[in-house]
Curated annotation (Swiss-Prot):
Gene name linked to the record: nuoB2
Top-level EC class as recorded in UniProt: translocase
Gene Ontology terms: cellular component: plasma membrane; respiratory chain complex I
Co-factor requirement: [4Fe-4S] cluster
Residues annotated for [4Fe-4S] cluster binding in this entry: 47-48, 113, 142
Cofactor note: Binds 1 [4Fe-4S] cluster.
The organism's place on the tree of life at top rank: Bacteria
Cellular compartment(s): Cell inner membrane
The protein's name in its UniProt record: NADH-quinone oxidoreductase subunit B 2
InterPro entries xrefs: NADH_UbQ_OxRdtase-like_20kDa, NADH_UQ_OxRdtase_20Kd_su
Coiled-coil segments on the chain, per record: none
Naturally occurring in which organism (per UniProt): Cereibacter sphaeroides (strain ATCC 17029 / ATH 2.4.9) (Rhodobacter sphaeroides)
EC number: 7.1.1.-
Reactions catalysed according to its record: a quinone + NADH + 5 H(+)(in) = a quinol + NAD(+) + 4 H(+)(out)
Length: 205
């Protein structure tokens, strides 16, 4: 590889311009192929999975987004849709399944329980799957309609189309991994949220 220094207004050599254009188009081609060939992993936890299974029927035609090939093994999938309540007992197997997926891989959190624990603010329920997995798209609802999952796939496709190559990868203890904030926003704002619900003592005033 050779480097040259020139003025900003100077014309670039034709061979360098052609190579740059080639790699730019190659990035676009790779992004296009990735976003139109998502292979979801068939994994459900509770009632939101029923809506996810409904989205796979011919009525909604998920094949339009290239995501109709449901995989039964994480080693052949690149999209994990977490649908339903994530109990602490299931967090470890879920993370193990995610770690078996090949890079690049993406995660969709489907439903209020997967997003933030939902109405189960108890010790046995993980308060948001983003506390141990890097979530790319959140789907609100209890349960969300299949159309909401369709919109999540479209949003994920637009995100994949703008990701640069190589993807944001850092070297971890077990190999390359995409960086993510391990502290979810729900936990960061928990104290402020709880302060709103505290009632003042009427005797103190």
């Amino acid at each position: 590889m050779s480097w040259t220094i020139g003025r900003p207004d100077a014309e670039a050599p034709e061979d360098r311009m052609a190579a740059s254009h080639l790699f730019t188009r190659l990035d676009d081609l790779v992004a296009w192929s990735r976003k139109h060939s998502l292979w979801p992993f068939n994994f459900g936890l509770s009632c939101c999975y029923v809506e996810m299974a409904t989205a796979l029927t011919p009525v909604y035609d998920q094949a339009r987004f290239g995501a109709e090939v449901i995989r039964s093994t994480p080693r052949q999938a690149d999209l994990l849709i977490v649908s339903g309540t994530v109990f602490r007992k299931m967090a470890v197997p879920l993370y193990r399944l995610y770690s078996q997926m090949r890079e690049p891989r993406w995660v969709i959190s489907m439903g209020a329980c997967a997003n933030s624990g939902g109405m189960y603010d108890i010790y046995s329920v993980v308060q948001g799957v983003d506390s141990f997995l890097p979530v790319d798209v959140y789907v609100p609802g209890c349960p969300p309609r299949p159309e909401a999952l369709m919109e999540a796939l479209v949003l994920l496709q637009s995100k994949i189309a703008t990701e640069a190559r190589p993807l944001q990868i850092r070297m971890g203890e077990t190999g390359p991994a995409r960086p993510f904030d391990p502290i979810p926003r729900r936990d960061a704002l928990r104290e402020a949220r709880m302060a709103v619900t505290r009632l003042a003592d009427p005797e103190a005033t």
